[in-house]
Amino acid sequence: MTGTISVDSFVAHALFDSGASYSFVSEDFVSRAGLSVQRLGHPILVSSTNGSISSCSVCQGCSVILADEVFSANLVVISLGAFDIILGMD
């Protein structure tokens, strides 16, 4: 399922993925929204149909507004294609 959400007051095109263990944010969206990035203590290996990549960066405590409800999300920074955000089960 896809949709439009707000992340730290910026509009984001999101994919809702119940099979994802983490939530992700695109490097491009991080730059556009000026999100604060922290280094992870260890890299996270992300597997997809296109192969595997690792990430050492996270945007912690992002405000995500979905259906008028505000949630806090930790978003792992990766290169994404068509989406700004992938919201997983975390």
Task: Kindly give the residue locations of the regions a language model identified.
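Aspartic protease
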Residues: 1-90
